[in-house]
Every structure is written in C-alpha cells, then in structure tokens.
Regions:
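Pyridoxal 5′-phosphate
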Residues: 1-413
C-alpha cells in the first residue's frame, strides 16, 4: 500500500546517515520506539568505553576520570528541556523519577479522607497504583478528569474540579496506548490562574525525545522522563525536571547521601535537583544517556518532531485504507504513537505476524490504563511507533503484513 505522494518529509534530516548511525537497522524493522528505541551507535560505544575503563582501573577511579563529562549530562538534559541543569535529577526510569516526586509530596503533606488527587483518564498504571494505595490505606480520593470532545484531557473540566482539597494533579503528556497529546501547558496555566496549591506532575516519558518540550512553559512541578524510549538512551536510565517551587518546599524521602549530608547537628540537603538522586548509578549508562541527548540536540528537536510526525501521519493514512482496521488515536494534534485494532483479528495475532516478518511493534491491553481502555471500548490494540531512522518503505511493509493477516479474516467476517 503506497504512500500518498502529496505527503512529504520536510525535516531536512539525512535518513541514510541516521540509519548508518543505527546499527540495528541492518537487523530489524524496529517500529517499537515507544517501548525501547534503537540507540545510535555513539550511545553503545560511549557505554562500552566507560565499562572498559572500569575494567582496567576500577569503578571509582573511572568515575573520577570521567567526572567532568558526567557532570555535563544534566546540562545536556537541561538544554533538551529548555531549562537549567540544576533543575535536572538523574534516575533509573521515568517511574523511578515519578515515584521520588510523589513520595516527596506525600512526605510533606497530611493526606486524609478529604484529600483529592486528580488524574488524566489516560494515565499509566504505574502512576495510578500508588494513588490507589493511598486511597485504600488513607482514604485519599482518586478522581479522573474527563476528556473533551477531541479525546484529550478537558482543561475546563479540570478547572471546575479544583478546590483546596486537591493535593496533586497527574497528567501524562503522551500516553503509551494512544497517539493523543494532552495539553500539558494549558493545564499548567489553568492551575496558575486558579492559584491552586496542588502539585503538578507530568509524565513525559513518551513525549521527550519526539516532541519539543519546554519544562518551564509546561508549568509542572515535576516532569518525569525515561531514557530508553524516544530519547534513544540505554535502559535503566531516566531523569526528571524539578521546579523551583519543588526544590524550595520538598525533600526526597528517604534521603540519600548523594543529595544529603549528615552533619553533627542533623543533615543538610543540596539546593539543586540532585537532592532527588541516589548515590549509586551505572555511570556507563549515565554517559550513554548523555550521548543520546547530545545526538538529539545535534539533530534538533524541531527536525526530529517533523520527521516523526510525517512518518506517523503517513502510517495512519495507510492503515485507514485497510478493511476492518480502526485507527484509535485521538486529539487534534497527534504524537508518533500510532494505535489500531481490527474488527475480527486479535491484536496479539497481528503483532505475531509482524514479528514473524521481522517487524517490531507492541500489543496494548487494559491493565496498563484501565480507565482509558474501558471508556473507549478497547480490549486490545497494536501500537506502532516510528522514529527518525525508519523509512516509508518499512511502514508500507508493515501495512502490507497487517493487510495480508487481516484480509482473509475480513472476507469471512
């Protein structure tokens, strides 16, 4: 199924060079970048180089030798998010970042039966489950914000739900199970207009690396990110933005000696976001993360976003022509995450057929986002997530396999 020739890539990126930089392109058609992206070779080379240094001179000594470069990783991440490196804390995943923020808020608050926490209806399970625990044990009220007519979080509905009992607002920028983009900056402005004291947590694990994200403009107190998805860093890495308000009012719990000093009279904490970090890290992974971020910065986030928007838009157009396929993505603007299902063929069967053809995609099921799946009557879906190194030909091959696998079933339906 060929691409409409009216659709053109205006990113200006050298796709041949991008593929040469990405060794995995020679092995697979990787369309699972919302799961874990193929890294550019510079990421792997950077990690291996540091591991070899640890092998030869010892871990502490290798850390000391690479100290200057390690310290610049936060600055690179700050540049990616249009903020200062002093507002960046390193972690092991987006969930690790999010949990550190959430526990700090709980540690500073007197949560009880009157406490309300508002969450987007498309929120990911790992962000909802801790709130459900507070609800079970402390009586905290978890409420989901309705979607608007386009299928994204309704800012007006959120404003009507705000009162002094709202302790936190939890929003994902781009959910894992749909191509929608939530209006996180508009929500931040709404909270400011209402002069709400609620803490604003944004899960940006699927947006950073594929969309330009200005953490300050979003207005979040915390913005959590993983390294392994669209940033194209190694697994076991993550980071978060911490606002000046968060740094002035919140302490991590439990404290760690990386960001906290034990003094004769008690303890003191760092004034920057490193107070939220743990002392122990894989510095090879940290350096790999830095290499991935620098690679993205060198390409330019506008160019990356344009390329991904082109590919995902083309894919949606092609899938929409396959009989029986429903493209599920909502919202006016859409991310690089493309989701669909078929009227008679299970998503898992389509994913298996694609895997057999050497194409990596994911299957989505309700346990990852119960409210969203139930509200939209979806029992399972196929998620396809291209990145800059993918080609139109790979997308055409993907759609061809989907069409072949579902064709006979559609004829019998």
């Amino acid at each position: 199924m060929a691409l409409d020739t009216h659709q053109q890539d205006k990113s200006g990126l050298d796709v041949a060079q991008l593929r040469a930089d990405t060794l995995g392109c020679t092995e697979v058609m990787h369309l699972n970048n919302a799961g874990s992206a193929l890294p550019p070779s510079v990421v792997v080379d950077t990690m291996v180089k540091h591991l070899r240094l640890e092998e030869m001179i010892g871990g502490y000594e290798a850390h000391a030798r690479a100290g200057d470069r390690i310290n610049t990783v936060r600055d690179s991440i700050g540049a990616l998010l249009d903020t200062s490196g002093s507002n960046i804390a390193l972690s092991t995943s987006a969930t690790d970042s999010w949990d550190r923020a959430f526990v700090a808020i709980k540690f500073a608050s007197d949560y009880g039966p009157d406490t309300r926490i508002l969450a987007s209806s498309s929120e990911y399970a790992s962000n909802v489950l801790p709130v459900m625990q507070l609800s079970r044990h402390l009586g905290v009220q978890l409420e989901f914000i309705p979607d608007d007519e386009t299928g994204v979080t309704d800012v007006g509905a959120l404003e009507s739900m705000l009162d002094d009992n709202v302790a936190a607002v939890l929003i994902n920028h781009c959910p894992s199970q749909n191509g929608l983009i939530n209006p996180v900056a508009a929500i931040g402005h709404a909270l400011a207009r209402a002069q709400s004291n609620a803490w604003y947590l944004v899960d940006a694990c699927q947006s950073v690396g594929q969309l330009p994200v200005d953490a300050v403009a979003v207005g979040a107190d915390f913005l959590s990110v993983t390294g392994r998805k669209f940033v194209r860093g190694p697994r076991g890495t993550g980071f978060m933005y911490c606002s000046p308000r968060a740094l002035s009012e919140l302490e991590p719990f439990p404290a760690d000696l990386h960001g906290t000093t034990w003094t004769p009279d008690g303890y003191t904490m760092r004034s920057d976001a490193q107070r939220f970090e743990a002392w122990e890290k894989s510095y090879a992974a940290v350096l790999g993360l830095g290499a991935a971020v620098d690679y993205a910065l060198n390409l330019g986030m506008d160019a990356i976003s344009t390329r991904i928007e082109f590919l995902s838009g083309a894919l949606r157009s092609m899938l929409a022509e396959v009989p029986g396929v429903a493209v599920l993505d909502r919202g006016v603007d859409k991310s690089g995450i493309v989701t669909f299902n078929h009227e008679s063929v299970e998503a898992a069967e389509i994913v298996a057929a694609l895997k057999n053809a050497g194409i990596n995609v994911s299957v989505g099921t309700p346990e990852y986002s119960q409210v969203d799946y139930i509200a939209h009557g979806v029992s399972s879906l196929v998620r396809v997530s291209p990145h800059v190194f993918n080609t139109v030909e790979e997308l055409e091959r993907c759609v061809e396999i989907v069409s072949d696998r579902t064709g006979s079933a559609t004829a019998q339906y």
